[in-house]
């Protein structure tokens, strides 16, 4: 499979061809078997259950999502004589915590032979966890095109206060009923746009990681995501009118992003530094009563805007690697002081971040010096990748056109809060992202001034 070939394949063809040998040297598999995005899609449930030999599905839902689609799902099952059991979380919102996963397990009916999630983000992630543990096929009935995790093989959860991606299982089938999706709250619809905008920066950071630390990169997978992103960005006007074609474009784009993660075997094609803004805000909302949070896609969209602003600062100010400056910066860096800042801002989740550094040693002076030489040698390549990013003003304008927040003030963060969040995004995962590049160059705090 080549870039040109992938650009001429639609979602249905992508799924039907299954696994394929790619020009990157790997064999890619989509993970998902069925994706139905159309009006009346819930009516496909009996046939889907029959295809996997399931007689009694277990329905997992939140209170709000059951109100949105529960009646439609249960009516289809009952009209076709299909028995089912269900658990509807009594709290709203449902948070992606150990309690939520444990509650799902404790209410699971072991006479069931399939799992149907009714919802979006947290419900879907929890349903995938339940499916992996039970070994059952999982179907998600989406209630909003709000995030890209429908078919990915991981679940984004809060464990011990740290946002982590846990291996779960990809949905066997995605049911996107446009009669339901088009009626989702507008807030949820634009959230899906935000999660797609995140691909603007995640794709470039994936390429930067290949250049600097030798991470595997697949141009075919990247092209697939870029094509879906372009389609979503051209559909925003129709989305505001709840036009089925526009809503379908967003839903399919989010599914394609999940397939891309399955192709890559990691979240790189869909998630980078911009997502770590969101993760930190989620972690703080669990740790501190007065810390606010938003829909994942809203936070990821904000993170995208801030990430673009930071890369622009790097280019516009004409920064170039300064070996002496970078080495002195690292020499004077105090890991103990930094860990104290993490604990103060993030709360208990900081312990897992600190433990991650104990395993990775990204702040080790010798490792830094090695990366720095690569950065110096390949600076022109690095900046060429960064220069392919669209202007932040262009993305801000698009966001404003759909009433998308453009400042983290919407969740209570002032400029200092954004700057602190920014500096800590390098500590969430073991990925090489923009803030690691700025740290390696010894200019992290200087770049952060762009948020003043």
What residues fall within each predicted segment?
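ATP/NTP phosphate-donor binding region
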Residues: 2-114
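C-terminal charged capping/lid subdomain of soluble metabolic enzymes
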Residues: 2-22, 317-452
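Solvent-exposed alpha-helices and their adjacent loops that cap or buttress functional pockets
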Residues: 27-29, 52, 107-110, 131, ...
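Gly/Ser/Thr-rich loops at beta-strand to alpha-helix junctions
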Residues: 41, 63-68, 119-124, 145-146
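Generic secondary-structure signature for well-ordered alpha-helical cores
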Residues: 50, 78-82, 162, 179-186, ...
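A short, small-residue-rich loop immediately preceding and capping a beta-strand
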Residues: 108-130, 134-144
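A glycine/threonine-rich phosphate-anchoring loop and its flanking beta-alpha core
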Residues: 132-231
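Active-site segments that bind and position negatively charged phosphate/pyrophosphate groups
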Residues: 224-379, 384-394
């Amino acid at each position: 499979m080549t870039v040109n070939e992938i650009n001429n394949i639609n979602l249905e063809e992508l799924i039907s061809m299954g696994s394929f040998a790619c020009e990157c040297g790997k064999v890619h598999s989509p993970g998902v078997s069925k994706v139905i995005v159309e009006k009346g899609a819930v009516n496909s449930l009996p046939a889907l259950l029959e295809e996997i030999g399931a007689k009694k599905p277990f329905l997992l839902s939140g209170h709000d999502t059951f109100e949105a689609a529960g009646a439609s799902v249960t009516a289809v099952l009952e009209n076709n004589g299909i028995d089912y059991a269900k658990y509807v979380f009594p709290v709203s919102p449902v948070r992606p915590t150990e309690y939520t996963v444990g509650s799902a397990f404790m209410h699971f009916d072991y006479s069931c032979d399939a799992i149907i999630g009714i919802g979006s983000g947290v419900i879907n992630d929890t349903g995938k966890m339940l499916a992996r543990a039970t070994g059952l096929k999982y179907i998600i009935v989406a209630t909003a095109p709000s995030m890209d995790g429908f078919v990915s093989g991981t679940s984004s959860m809060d464990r011990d206060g740290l946002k982590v991606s846990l291996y779960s299982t990809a949905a066997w089938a995605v049911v996107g009923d446009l009669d339901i999706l088009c009626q989702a709250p507008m807030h949820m619809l634009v959230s899906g746009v935000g999660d797609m905008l995140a691909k603007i920066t995640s794709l470039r950071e994936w390429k930067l990681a290949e250049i600097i630390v030798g991470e595997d990169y697949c141009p075919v997978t990247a092209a697939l995501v870029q094509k879906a992103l372009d389609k979503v960005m051209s559909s925003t006007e129709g989305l505001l009118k709840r036009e089925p074609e526009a809503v379908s474009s967003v839903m399919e784009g989010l599914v394609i992003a999940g397939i891309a993660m399955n192709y890559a075997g990691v979240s790189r094609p869909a998630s980078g530094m911009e997502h770590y803004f969101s993760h930190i805000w989620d972690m703080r909302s669990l740790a501190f009563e007065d810390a606010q949070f938003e829909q994942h896609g809203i936070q990821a969209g904000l993170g995208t805007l801030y990430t673009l602003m930071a890369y622009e600062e790097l280019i516009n100010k004409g920064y170039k690697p300064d070996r002496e400056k970078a080495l002195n910066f690292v020499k004077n860096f105090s890991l103990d002081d930094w860990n104290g800042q993490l604990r103060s801002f993030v709360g208990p989740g900081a312990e897992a971040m600190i433990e991650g550094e104990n395993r990775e040693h990204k702040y080790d002076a010798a490792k830094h010096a090695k990366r720095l030489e690569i950065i110096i040698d390949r600076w022109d390549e690095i900046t060429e990748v960064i220069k392919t990013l669209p202007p932040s003003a262009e993305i801000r304008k698009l966001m404003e056109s759909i009433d998308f927040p453009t400042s983290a003030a919407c969740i209570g963060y002032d400029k200092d809060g954004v700057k602190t969040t920014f500096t800590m995004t390098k500590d969430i995962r073991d990925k090489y992202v923009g803030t690691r590049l700025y740290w390696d160059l010894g200019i992290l705090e200087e770049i952060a001034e762009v948020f003043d």
